[in-house]
Amino acid sequence: MASATRQFARAATRATRNGFAIAPRQVIRQQGRRYYSSEPAQKSSSAWIWLTGAAVAGGAGYYFYGNSASSATAKVFNPSKEDYQKVYNEIAARLEEKDDYDDGSYGPVLVRLAWHASGTYDKETGTGGSNGATMRFAPESDHGANAGLAAARDFLQPVKEKFPWITYSDLWILAGVCAIQEMLGPAIPYRPGRSDRDVSGCTPDGRLPDASKRQDHLRGIFGRMGFNDQEIVALSGAHALGRCHTDRSGYSGPWTFSPTVLTNDYFRLLVEEKWQWKKWNGPAQYEDKSTKSLMMLPSDIALIEDKKFKPWVEKYAKDNDAFFKDFSNVVLRLFELGVPFAQGTENQRWTFKPTHQE
């Protein structure tokens, strides 16, 4: 049922993406929350031992050895675009099959995993970023900003086991790319080449945005990663997806009426709706005056209060194509932060075909 409802919502969004009007929608059902353990250790195989090898022009080489007496020669497997497309398709198939999560989709939490894995980058020290997948370990997995992301890591563990040659780092980012595209967002070019690190690579707490803060905080956090005002606003458009949970961030509710479809509705709602403080026992957040079913965070409202942020909000509210173009460009940059890609691969990114275009 959730899958059928999600498909209907996506079809309706395709037809009305340029004809948005703020009005009460069908009530979004809030699924029962599930609790997840961190992903299990990767199973070893009696037949193969996989080792990450040297980086090559299109990604990484993976060496494996047979354990039979007649197989003494190491072989190298260099995954191609087609191999990564198979991983993409597997993630997309699981997104369609596993519809027992928020609003019928794990898509938003996969985007959040990729975002939080990348958003720890510090341009001054060169630490953090999407290389390493260090959120597999405490203390990074226990950072408050990462609460609830075990759900995304557990969702991807069977994919990792089916394709053991892909690193967790590359898998998490590919999952973010897949989720954005499968939720009708823009194409996000992808470049493999990330390696996994151990617990020593965990980043310090406090590098991700704090939803309770406003414009100065946003500029400090995003500026550390190298983003300007326009890029901060474009990246914030990811809040069109998903919802907040009281047992994670403390906040509650979705930002938009279609939290499993990426559109510019987040910006339209910011500009066109009236927002008021929510009267409840939780942390300070806003609710829409019309239906009281949507929410905005203090960091969201900061985008329309700041005179330099607001023009970009207004631009994206009027032009979904402009938002998609800028969002794709800045997400590509975000997902590559901190990755020591092999020289000569700058223009060797791949774009994968979404399943809804097949």
UniProtKB/Swiss-Prot annotation:
Protein's recorded name: Cytochrome c peroxidase, mitochondrial
Catalytic activities: 2 Fe(II)-[cytochrome c] + H2O2 + 2 H(+) = 2 Fe(III)-[cytochrome c] + 2 H2O
Required cofactor(s): heme b
Spans annotated as Disordered: 194-213
Catalytic site: H116, W255
Keyword Iron part of the UniProt annotation: yes
Known function: Destroys radicals which are normally produced within the cells and which are toxic to biological systems.
Organism in which the protein naturally occurs: Gibberella zeae (strain ATCC MYA-4620 / CBS 123657 / FGSC 9075 / NRRL 31084 / PH-1)
Similarity remark: Belongs to the peroxidase family. Cytochrome c peroxidase subfamily.
GO cellular component terms, semicolon-separated: mitochondrial intermembrane space; mitochondrial matrix
Binding residue positions for heme b: H239
Source taxon at top rank: Eukaryota
Annotated compartments: Mitochondrion matrix; Mitochondrion intermembrane space
The protein's Enzyme Commission number: 1.11.1.5
Manner of cofactor binding, per the entry note: Binds 1 heme b (iron(II)-protoporphyrin IX) group per subunit.
